[in-house]
Amino acid sequence: MILIIYAHPYPHHSHANKRMLEQARTLDGVEIRSLYQLYPDFNIDIAAEQEALSRADLIVWQHPMQWYSIPPLLKLWIDKVLSHGWAYGHGGTAPRGKHLLWAVTTGGGESHFEIGAHPGFDVLSQPLQATAIYCGLNWLPPFAMHCTFICDDETLEGQARHYKQRLLEWQEAHHG
């Protein structure tokens, strides 16, 4: 099962993430947990989230990039749900062996995220990748949709279909 942990503080304003979710929903075996819809008060049901994670084979952290980072509720989710004794540390093996895909949208162009004048995706992904590895997750190459503020509908839809294809290819490779 693919579990998408969706963290968009303003989901009604998102054209890119909305299209990505629409495409993902067309696949069998996909569950979407919209954190800002489930937890507008930031009071995360840790047991429910851990139960959802335990059913998943692929975990996707999908969100818009905000100031070169993740939205605050996703950070809190990571801090609370991936807890000591459950996700890491003595007896913390629950997520071990599962896969993690970082699916992020940006307002900037792809060149904005090349190492040089700006930090590249290899740098920006390091905290998430380190978290994944620490919890025994298999880190997959990230999916990034760039220029989402200026893309036309056709481009956004094409990128959303590419996202769906990534998920489908993972399903086919891991579940025949």
Swiss-Prot record:
Gene3D superfamilies: 3.40.50.360. It is found in: Cell inner membrane. It comes from the Bacteria. Its EC number is 1.6.5.2. Its main location: membrane. Homodimer. Interacts with KefC. This is Glutathione-regulated potassium-efflux system ancillary protein KefF. It comes from Shigella dysenteriae serotype 1 (strain Sd197). The lineage of its organism: Bacteria, Pseudomonadati, Pseudomonadota, Gammaproteobacteria, Enterobacterales.
